[in-house]
């Protein structure tokens, strides 16, 4: 793909979607534009564990506040459009929106995995996913776009490991999952993606099953370690706002009109991906969704499903699986080798 096409369709599309979302529309969901600092709930309950991107945005906010004390050509215009914190959210999320589109393009252009994806299809998928991400940001948070980028980065190294059986790819994938877990629990979907590939055929032998467990061991450990360490060092207290057991939203999600509309929209998007998926890949998407049931159940249990951003990671994952072509399932040809050796 020529550089000008990457600039126009892969970089500028997400930038314009972000500009339209943040400055063309004002969310009726919450008055983000006038927020001077992150609201208190980002430091409490389950939100308090998503600290990586929050700390970066806090530092960006302090930096912009210093800049706003000086005169510069766009200062008056920028102050009318939002606070330094709001502009920090825009810059941070736009940066990762661009990286996400670049990563989607980078993955889909690999012919060894996506031989049936041509340039026009690839650009169309980049456009579709960028539009869905931008559209979902009537709820603006600091961790969604970065979480999607890290999820895709994990997919990249998952595919590398699936094909080459190089232990270094598994190590890098596990490191990405560890970092991603400090940002948002979406990182667990990397494990679901890996498992969906490696369990393309259920291993018939005990040894084959143990090999599968070995493959998943490091990524699962990379998720569980930061997940539980964060909960040990940042405990939740009963009575606090957004305390896990006091913020169950399941009944609300099943009865509220907006919430029903939210999860029906998510189901419609998944149905849309199924419609365009290669027929032989629909089972892989279903397998991924079944393995991802803990994530899906959790967003129904404590999420607010009117926030369709909760379904976006599932959509990205399903799209990657929809067009993926691998030569042979792993367990169809595996000889009983340690999982850290290159498969030949």
Language model feature labels by segment:
Residues 1-18:
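Start-transfer (signal-anchor) and selected internal transmembrane alpha helices
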Residues 103, 146-164, 169-172, 318-321:
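Specific aromatic-rich, kink-prone transmembrane helix
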Residues 135-153, 183, 310-314:
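Multi-pass, polyprenyl lipid-linked donor-dependent membrane glycosyltransferases
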């Amino acid at each position: 793909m020529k550089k000008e096409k990457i600039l126009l369709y892969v970089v500028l599309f997400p930038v314009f979607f972000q500009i339209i979302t943040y400055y063309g529309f004002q969310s009726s969901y919450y008055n983000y534009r006038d927020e001077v600092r992150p609201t208190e709930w980002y430091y409490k309950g389950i939100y308090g564990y998503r600290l990586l991107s929050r700390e970066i945005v806090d530092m960006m906010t302090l930096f912009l506040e210093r800049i706003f004390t000086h005169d510069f050509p766009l200062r008056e215009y920028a102050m009318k459009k939002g606070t330094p914190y709001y502009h920090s959210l825009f810059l941070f999320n736009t940066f990762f929106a661009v990286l996400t589109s670049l990563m989607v393009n980078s993955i889909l252009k690999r012919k060894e995995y996506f031989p049936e994806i041509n340039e026009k299809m690839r650009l169309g998928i980049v456009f579709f996913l960028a539009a869905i991400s931008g559209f979902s940001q009537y709820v603006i948070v600091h961790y969604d776009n970065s979480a999607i980028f890290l999820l895709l980065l994990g997919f990249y190294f998952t595919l590398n490991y699936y094909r080459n059986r190089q232990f270094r790819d598994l190590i890098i994938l596990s490191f990405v999952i560890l970092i991603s877990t400090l940002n948002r629990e979406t990182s667990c979907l990397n494990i679901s993606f890996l498992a969906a590939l490696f369990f393309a055929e259920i291993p018939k032998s005990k040894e084959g099953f143990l090999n599968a467990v070995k493959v998943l061991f490091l990524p699962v450990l990379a998720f569980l370690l930061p997940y539980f360490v964060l909960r040990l060092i940042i405990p939740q207290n009963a009575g606090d706002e957004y305390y896990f057991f006091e913020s169950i939203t399941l009944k609300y999600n099943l009865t509220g009109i907006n919430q029903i509309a939210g999860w029906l929209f998510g189901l419609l998007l998944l149905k849309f991906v199924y419609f365009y998926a290669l027929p032989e890949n629909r089972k892989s998407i279903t397998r991924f969704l079944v393995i991802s049931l803990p994530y899906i159940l959790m967003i129904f249990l404590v999420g607010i499903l009117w926030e369709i951003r909760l379904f976006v990671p599932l959509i990205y994952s399903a799209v990657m699986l929809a067009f993926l072509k691998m030569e042979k399932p792993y367990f169809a040809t595996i000889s009983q080798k340690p999982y850290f050796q290159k498969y030949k």
